């Protein structure tokens, strides 16, 4: 397994729409394993392949405190959603920034697991929010897109400044 580079906003590659996985094979399983390793190293609870510049419909999630309840969703599709909720969301692609995002309280999704088997999952609370957040990434949508233009611009400026400082430090 290896750590993958997480793209940071406003990198335009985060806006690419992911393509469906055609065949769940060893290469896809390696991507899944690397995504989990990266997500845990970054102390995240979810990661979409788009965030690591892999534009396929793959999501990994683990919202457990014990970090041992891995959820793999390949080619996820939202079947149902209900209720309303929302929290101040963060994102590995937008470090140290948060913003309130309205979400459905409950979702029902269909996806393929790590072995290519189809499953359905009903989720609520943090898991439902995380699934919606990660599925947004697969269509090039970020949590900042739900914020006011002013707040989005402030976050963009902070992220651009961070990128400049990081680039200088690497020279």
Curated annotation (Swiss-Prot):
It catalyses: N-terminal N-formyl-L-methionyl-[peptide] + H2O = N-terminal L-methionyl-[peptide] + formate. The active site is at residue 134. GO terms for molecular function: metal ion binding; peptide deformylase activity. Fe cation binds at residues 91, 133, 137. Binds 1 Fe(2+) ion. Its cofactor is Fe(2+). One of its GO terms (biological process) is co-translational protein modification. It comes from the Bacteria. InterPro entries: Peptide_deformylase, Peptide_deformylase_sf. Transmembrane segments: none annotated. Its EC number is 3.5.1.88. It holds the Pfam family Pep_deformylase. Keywords: Hydrolase, Iron, Metal-binding, Protein biosynthesis. Removes the formyl group from the N-terminal Met of newly synthesized proteins. Requires at least a dipeptide for an efficient rate of reaction. N-terminal L-methionine is a prerequisite for activity but the enzyme has broad specificity at other positions. Belongs to the polypeptide deformylase family. This is Peptide deformylase. It comes from Sodalis glossinidius (strain morsitans). The lineage of its organism: Bacteria, Pseudomonadati, Pseudomonadota, Gammaproteobacteria, Enterobacterales. The gene is def.
């Amino acid at each position: 397994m290896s750590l993958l580079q997480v793209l940071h906003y406003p990198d335009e590659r985060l806006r690419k729409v992911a393509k469906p996985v055609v065949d769940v094979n060893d290469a896809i399983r390696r991507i899944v394993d690397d995504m989990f390793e990266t997500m845990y190293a970054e102390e995240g609870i979810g990661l979409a392949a788009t965030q690591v510049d892999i534009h396929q419909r793959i999501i990994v999630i683990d919202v457990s405190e014990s970090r041992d309840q891995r959820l793999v969703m390949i080619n996820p599709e939202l079947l149902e959603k209900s209720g309303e909720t929302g929290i101040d969301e963060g994102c590995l692609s937008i470090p140290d920034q948060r913003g309130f995002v309205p979400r459905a309280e409950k979702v029902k999704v269909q996806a393929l697991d790590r072995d290519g088997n189809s499953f359905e999952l009903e989720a609520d609370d943090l898991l439902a929010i995380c699934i919606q957040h990660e599925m947004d990434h697969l269509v090039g949508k970020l949590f900042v897109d739900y914020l006011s233009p002013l707040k989005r611009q402030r976050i963009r400026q902070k992220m651009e400044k961070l990128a400049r400082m990081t680039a200088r430090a690497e020279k």
